[in-house]
């Protein structure tokens, strides 16, 4: 598999809400965010999920994941950190690769590891 093919297979999942991260247009740049940031995508009264990742952070993470793939250390359960982004490879098959992420700079510590319905 080429690096380009590898990158196209990656799907980022919010580590707080277990939802697929969305590519969104910010004021100056594109970025990924949890869909539960938007009020329409969460139950009434639930706080917004602040998990997000810039394109720069995404590219650094993809570079790290590609290096792991090249070194034959890439497998489900692979965990690590790239800057403020903590990641874990969840699923790997012929069609896609899911990577769960939490940006520790944008997500409150007390939210990490808790059931989102409690927040």
Over which residues does each language-model region extend?
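Basic, low-complexity terminal or inter-domain segments flanking catalytic cores
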Residues: 1-119
């Amino acid at each position: 598999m080429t690096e380009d093919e590898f990158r196209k297979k990656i799907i980022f999942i919010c580590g707080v809400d277990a939802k697929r991260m969305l590519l969104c247009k910010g004021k100056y740049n594109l970025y990924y965010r949890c869909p539960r940031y938007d009020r329409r995508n969460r139950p009434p009264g639930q706080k917004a999920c602040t998990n997000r990742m810039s394109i720069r952070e995404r590219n650094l993470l993809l570079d790290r994941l590609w290096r792991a793939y090249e070194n034959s250390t890439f497998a489900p359960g692979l965990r690590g950190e790239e800057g403020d982004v903590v990641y874990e490879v969840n699923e790997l098959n012929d069609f896609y690769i899911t990577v769960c992420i939490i940006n520790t700079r944008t997500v409150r510590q007390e939210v990490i590891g808790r059931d989102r319905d409690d927040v």
